[in-house]
Design a protein with these regions (language model features):
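Conserved acidic catalytic loop of the alpha/beta-hydrolase fold
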Residues: 1-13
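Short beta-strand immediately N-terminal to the catalytic nucleophile in serine-hydrolase-like folds
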Residues: 15-17, 42
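Conserved serine/cysteine hydrolase catalytic core
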Residues: 100-156, 161-164
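Flexible "cap/lid" loop of the alpha/beta hydrolase fold
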Residues: 26-31, 35-69
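Conserved alpha/beta-hydrolase catalytic His-Asp/Glu region
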Residues: 51, 66-123
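Catalytic histidine-centered segment of alpha/beta-hydrolase-like enzymes
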Residues: 165-181
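Gly/Ala-rich beta-loop-alpha elbow adjacent to hydrolase catalytic centers
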Residues: 17, 21, 25
Length: 189
């Protein structure tokens, strides 16, 4: 992230990260707090999580790599694992037709192999971040489920603020884009 913003010529920048991207954003805030104008973390806390994504990754890996499959067929196959059609549509944005057939743009094998590392969050203690820090949390089906998760964010970012969108889960930007946009605009104001 820092290499990219340096190449773009930004001294200070706002950083928004969802899920694993939120962990990356918190790590950037920890390593270069003076560079951030705003930090917005979406539905992930600075804690180690138990793995609940391997079944989803395995479901994605199990989808047919058949050039004859339509997007609708892939959507139907994925529906057994992901009931919400908006989330399926979001995931299917990463499923592309190539000359060799349908392929995932993300490296599912690497995700499956590295899941224990991705679920961890090894850094602890407060971050000396002068910039505003906001956690936009989903409701009970999101990753930020407990008071302990919220407290971990406030301990890491003592001047942090938490906004909860109780009617959405882990993908608030997909499940209720308008509410998410309002929370994000407020956090970046």
């Amino acid at each position: 992230v820092l290499t990219t913003v340096d190449a773009l010529g930004f001294d200070r920048f706002s950083l928004v990260g969802h899920s694993l991207g939120g962990k990356v954003a918190m790590t950037v805030a920890r390593s270069a707090p003076e560079r951030l104008a705003h930090l917005v973390v979406v539905d992930v806390a600075p804690v180690a999580y138990t793995d609940r994504y391997t079944p989803l990754v395995e479901s994605l890996r199990a989808l047919p790599d058949d050039a004859g499959c339509s997007r609708a067929e892939i959507d139907r196959a994925l529906a057994a694992q992901v009931a919400d059609p908006n989330i399926r549509a979001f995931l299917l944005q990463n499923y592309r037709r190539t000359d060799a057939g349908w392929r995932w743009r993300m490296n599912l094998e690497a995700l499956a192999e590295q899941m224990p590392v991705l679920m961890d969050y090894p850094a602890h203690g407060p971050v000396t971040l002068a910039a505003p820090a906001t956690l936009i949390a989903g409701g009970p089906t999101g990753l930020v489920r407990s008071d302990a998760d919220r407290q971990a964010f406030l301990e890491a970012f003592p001047h942090g603020h938490i906004v909860t969108l109780p009617h959405v889960g882990h993908w608030p930007h997909v499940e209720d884009p308008a509410a998410f946009r309002a929370a994000l605009v407020s956090a970046l104001a």
